[in-house]
């Protein structure tokens, strides 16, 4: 099967994340009196962030209104924007730009998709010089489709934009169960879990995938040989 498109996640897959997303989640939740355990925060990584907020509030025994979810999410977004605009820790995971370049040199399209909203995503792309068309071929955020992960909507929309017809010619690469669920739901030919950040191989192994990789160099070997 010929590979035509690789869809990469951002935080934890190609974007270094020293628990910055988790810190922002916990801070926004603490502001409304909720202290989720770390494993609950890890479990919602990869989901659209408003859905993650609603789930964490529900797990804390709340019956959150739409307004409460929106307020907590707005606090999370503000914390993330501050971090990605100013932190010296914002950098790629080793090998990310090289992987993108090698894939594109081989004639393979490269797109990012993410559970972040567009305002956060654009800050990341600016810091790392990954804006299309020079840094990649396309970017899609979970607030730009009807359903985020683990539904396949973002992958299908990226395929539509880039003229890719067969999901078996698409690879999805991510570091969360939601990423793997998304790739599997889309019918991607490659569904690769990266075990360098939020989840270990043991945590990802029960979820549908074709491969697990402990580095982006291994991802490159899997995709390009």
Question: Residue locations for each model-derived region?
Answer:
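Structural recognition of alpha->loop->beta junctions
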Residues: 128-142, 203-221
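Acidic, Mg2+-coordinating phosphoryl-transfer loop and its flanking beta/alpha structural elements
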Residues: 171-211
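Active-site neighborhood of HAD-like aspartate-dependent phosphohydrolases
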Residues: 1-43
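Substrate-recognition/cap helix-loop segment adjacent to the acidic, metal-dependent catalytic center
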Residues: 30-32, 56-62, 97, 101-111, ...
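Conserved Lys-Pro-Asp/Glu-containing loop-to-beta segment of HAD-superfamily phosphomonoesterases
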Residues: 149-180
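A short, structured active-site edge motif that brings together acidic residues
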Residues: 40-45, 68-70, 74, 132-147
């Amino acid at each position: 099967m010929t590979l035509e498109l690789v869809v990469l996640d951002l935080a934890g897959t190609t974007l270094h994340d020293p628990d910055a997303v988790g810190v922002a989640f916990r801070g926004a939740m603490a502001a409304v009196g909720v202290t989720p355990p770390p494993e609950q925060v890890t479990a919602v990584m990869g989901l659209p962030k408003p859905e993650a907020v609603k789930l964490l509030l529900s797990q804390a025994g709340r019956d959150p209104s739409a307004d409460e979810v929106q307020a907590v999410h707005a606090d999370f977004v503000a914390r993330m924007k501050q971090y990605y605009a100013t932190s010296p820790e914002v950098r790629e995971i080793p090998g990310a730009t090289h992987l993108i370049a090698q894939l594109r040199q081989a004639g393979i399209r490269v797109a990012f998709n993410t559970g972040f909203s567009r305002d956060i995503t654009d800050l990341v792309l600016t810091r790392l010089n990954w804006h299309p068309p020079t840094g990649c071929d396309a970017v899609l955020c979970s607030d730009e489709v009807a359903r985020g992960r683990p539904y396949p909507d973002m992958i299908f929309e990226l395929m539509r934009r880039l003229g890719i017809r067969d999901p078996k010619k698409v690879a999805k690469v991510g570091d969360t169960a939601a990423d793997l669920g998304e790739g599997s739901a889309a019918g991607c030919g490659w569904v690769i879990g990266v075990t360098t950040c939020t989840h270990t191989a043991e945590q990802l192994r029960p979820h549908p995938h074709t491969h697990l990789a402990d580095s982006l160099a291994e991802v490159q070997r899997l995709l390009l040989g």
